[in-house]
């Protein structure tokens, strides 16, 4: 039961891991060309950048626009500046216009929010160099072992608890870091520091099992530290000093501790006590966790101290312990405003690669308008239903968006993925975060709570409390 095979047990981890990798290399589990399958029929990306920019700037109907033609001319002028002179020049001109407006007595409303789309455009992404067949296979095994560990523990004692849905939503976020960005301590390098989100601990144990660092007996003692070799419920170096680096529970401790750890490292570097090796401090957080006073309490200090060695990754699966995080609001936009206002570099990872052709063909702006206007409760409901529901409730908001997906089947629409589950989108965000200079960075990734759990747990309010899966749900989770 510890692997994706039916009721089989891995006895020798390293050889089995080698076998898994070999199988993945020869399989067609995941093909890079798969990302292009939705870009078919009427969906095509324009070849000419100037024409594309101009066509994208057609005005969405606005009853407050007394002169749409004038608005169109202004937008086309801005597009021409961006294309011919670059975004820096465009930013300068916009700032000059805003300053002049204030001088003229115009009180322009201020916002720290950008549209509800990815911060990094598709054509600027750095693609992951990894073998997606192997990485996806390994990710599936880790998700499976993480879930089964909790299920097996609660079959013995229902009071043990544990969390399946959190790591299921965050697996890709951790996987990309583990495979491509985090550097271990050695004799020549101090190592990066990672604050793991507390409720995702089962997934970290599951990966350690696949790597041969933990055995099956230890996984069978999850949340049973009283037994020799038992695993602690959450990251805790006092209980497991040879495994965990930092404690991150209760919720809210991780982000504040990470800020002061990054600050202390800068302190030591600035005084010549340690070398500047480009080490990073990563903190993985939940969107519900960000409501804890400690979570946002010191973000101003991080910006003032210019802690560019600090990276937050907020897993926005839209759900907390007892329900939605912001049912009638948008937690990603709220967090963006808080962090940008404090002076952080913000990278939003909202939409996966399957959305790219649709966004490229959103000539009227109605798709982005629908994205901006849809609240988190609606997004959560969509991922608990099916493609037909998404077509009607989301794309059906405007005739233009309905037409945009007219060539897609309900199955195609259901495959439109969220950014936090797309390895290429996550890789691009991490790559940019590690290269940022002069400020801390927060990566805000949109995911699905209980990803892969099917009707029992995917995007439903009870996901966080789900400790058991019946045989049908286990088979679905295994085969997905």
Region roles according to the model:
Residues 130-142, 146-156, 163-305, 328-329:
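Cofactor-binding active-site loop characterized by glycine-rich and histidine/acidic residues
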Residues 73, 151-154, 181-185, 238, ...:
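Short acidic (Asp/Glu) and glycine-rich catalytic loops that position anionic groups and cofactors
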Residues 2-61:
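Acidic, low-complexity intrinsically disordered tails
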Residues 64-68, 83, 87, 128, ...:
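Hydrophobic alpha-helical scaffolding
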Residues 194-197, 309-317:
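Short internal beta-strands
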Residues 192, 279-281, 310, 439-447:
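Generic beta-sheet signal
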Residues 316-480:
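Long, well-ordered, tryptophan-enriched scaffold segments
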Residues 35, 40, 45-211, 475-478:
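N-terminal amphipathic, basic-rich helices that act as targeting or association modules
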């Amino acid at each position: 039961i510890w692997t994706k095979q039916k009721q089989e047990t891995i006895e020798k981890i390293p050889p089995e891991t080698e076998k898994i990798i070999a199988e993945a290399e020869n399989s067609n589990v995941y093909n890079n060309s798969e990302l292009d399958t939705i870009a078919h029929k009427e969906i095509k990306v324009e070849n000419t950048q100037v024409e594309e920019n101009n066509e994208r700037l057609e005005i969405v109907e606005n009853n407050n626009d007394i002169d749409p033609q004038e608005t169109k001319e202004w937008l086309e002028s801005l597009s021409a500046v961006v294309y011919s002179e670059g975004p820096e020049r465009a930013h300068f001109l916009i700032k000059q216009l805003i300053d002049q407006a204030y001088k003229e007595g115009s009180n322009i409303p201020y916002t720290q929010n950008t549209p509800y789309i990815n911060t990094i455009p598709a054509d600027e992404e750095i693609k992951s160099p990894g073998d997606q067949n192997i990485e996806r296979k390994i990710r599936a095994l880790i998700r499976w072992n993480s879930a089964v560990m909790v299920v097996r523990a609660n079959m013995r004692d229902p009071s043990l608890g544990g969390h399946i849905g959190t790591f299921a939503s965050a697996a890709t976020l951790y996987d990309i870091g583990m495979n491509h960005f985090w550097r271990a301590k050695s004799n020549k390098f101090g190592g990066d520091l990672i604050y793991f989100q507390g409720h995702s601990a089962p997934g970290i144990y599951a990966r350690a099992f696949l790597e041969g660092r933990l055995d099956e007996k230890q996984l069978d003692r999850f949340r049973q530290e009283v037994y020799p070799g038992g695993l602690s419920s959450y990251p805790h170096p006092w209980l497991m000093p040879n495994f965990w680096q930092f404690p991150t529970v209760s919720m809210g401790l991780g982000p504040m501790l990470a800020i002061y750890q990054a600050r202390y490292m800068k302190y030591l570097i600035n005084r010549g006590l340690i070398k500047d090796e480009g080490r990073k401090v990563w903190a993985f957080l939940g969107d519900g966790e960000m409501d804890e006073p400690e979570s946002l309490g010191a973000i101003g200090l991080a910006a003032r101290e210019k802690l560019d060695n600090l990276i937050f990754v907020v897993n926005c699966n839209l759900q907390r312990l007892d329900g939605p995080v912001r049912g009638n609001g948008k937690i990603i936009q709220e967090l963006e405003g808080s962090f940008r206002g404090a002076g952080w570099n913000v990278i939003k990872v909202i939409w996966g690669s399957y959305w790219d052709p649709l966004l490229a063909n959103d000539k009227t702006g109605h798709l982005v308008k629908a994205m901006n206007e849809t609240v988190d409760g609606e997004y959560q409901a969509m991922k608990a239903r099916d493609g037909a529901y998404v077509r009607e409730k989301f794309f059906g908001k405007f005739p233009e968006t309905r037409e945009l997906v007219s060539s897609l089947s309900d199955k195609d629409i259901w495959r439109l993925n969220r950014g936090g589950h797309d390895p290429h989108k996550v890789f691009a965000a991490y790559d940019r975060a590690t290269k940022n200079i002069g400020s801390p960075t927060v990566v805000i990734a949109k995911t699905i709570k209980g990803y892969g759990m099917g009707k029992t747990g995917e995007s439903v309010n009870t996901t966080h409390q789900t400790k058991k899966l019946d045989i049908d749900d286990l088979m679905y989770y295994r085969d997905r």
